[in-house]
Amino acid sequence: MRYLTAGESHGPQLTTIIEGVPAGLYIEQDDINYELARRQKGHGRGRRMQIEKDQAKVLSGVRHGKTLGSPIALVVENNDWKHWTKVMGAEPITEEEESEMKRQISRPRPGHADLNGAIKYGHRDMRNVLERSSARETTVRVAAGAVAKQILAHLGIKVAGHVLEIGGVKAAHTAYESIEDLQKVTEESPVRCYDSEAGQKMMDAIDEAKKNGDSIGGIVEVIVEGMPVGVGSYVHYDRKLDSKLAGAVLSINAFKGVEFGIGFEAASKNGSEVHDEIIWDEEKGYTRKTNRLGGLEGGMSTGMPIVVRGVMKPIPTLYKPLQSVDIETKEPFSASIERSDSCAVPAASVVAEAVVAWEIANAVVEQFGLDQIDRIKENVEKMRQLQREF
């Protein structure tokens, strides 16, 4: 499977075309819109989320609630477009109109794509860069992830994301009873944190950063349960499941690090403290005593829960901006200010959940794939049976 996205932050709409989704999958627009609504929530979000009410429209690939096997086209309209029709319109304008155009940007923000993108593509108005590099694009990535989650749900695979840390405040209590329990509690938290006490401190940290015109980042975790053994490959580097998951998480705006299981802690431990001992269970077959490697060995799933974490840096748009340079005058200036969040970590956990779900679904369809969802399910069940009987 694959998908492409198109659209600018303040353009008329965002679009994604999804190819390779098997036929016969039951899906409704409400399933997608539920995920889009989750992305818009979260303490620390900016005024843009008060303007947008993201709703996906399915234009192709689905008939009477079931996928056809043909490409699925989804669009999400930008409500804010009506305020940007002249600035972001596709029609040509004169040089005089361009010189008088408001909202042109010549002072790049440190930490953003502004300057590098302007040099790469030759844009004197860096709005041409920031409109596409904006995290607004993740709206349709979440929509694509919603389709992937429906595939996984049909196969008995569950995906849940939550927040572990914001602005140095760490969740102390993360021992959830089940993945359903984790989902229920985090959906009720304004910062998507399972630990309610830590969640309140996270909100306080966000409020303090906002008051100071600053921003803060954090750490999110995504858990995948119900995986069959052997998804991925040890044969080639580009087919390793952990490689694909790491790339997906790092492709999210502002994400700068990724780890699996105990992650970077493994560097300071002995091998006996890192690797998961193999045991035989009458019901499950081969399994592990622990899950320190996060459900992945040799580029493949072990059948244990996959645990992946991503580090999100603070958003680079600051209301007390850092020093920059005006590219027209070469004089020092404060960086440009755009409407932005003070913290997007809670929303980013939903995006991380979506991209992980996509990579898992893609790997499963590739490995067990046929063109019909029920046949894929039969093959997945055969692998689960093999794990029990091998």
UniProtKB/Swiss-Prot annotation:
NADP(+) binds at R39, R45. The keyword DNA-binding does not apply. Its EC number is 4.2.3.5. This is Chorismate synthase. Its cofactor is FMNH2. Pathway: Metabolic intermediate biosynthesis; chorismate biosynthesis; chorismate from D-erythrose 4-phosphate and phosphoenolpyruvate: step 7/7. FMN binds at R132, S133, S134, N253, A254, G298, K313, P314, I315, P316, T317, R339. It comes from the Bacteria. It catalyses: 5-O-(1-carboxyvinyl)-3-phosphoshikimate = chorismate + phosphate. GO terms for cellular component: cytosol. InterPro entries: Chorismate_synth (IPR000453), Chorismate_synth_AroC_sf (IPR035904), Chorismate_synthase_CS (IPR020541). The keyword Mitochondrion does not apply. Belongs to the chorismate synthase family. Signal peptide: none annotated. Reduced FMN (FMNH(2)). One of its GO terms (biological process) is amino acid biosynthetic process. Homotetramer. This reaction introduces a second double bond into the aromatic ring system. Keywords: Amino-acid biosynthesis, Aromatic amino acid biosynthesis, FAD, Flavoprotein, FMN, Lyase, NADP. GO terms for molecular function: chorismate synthase activity; FMN binding.
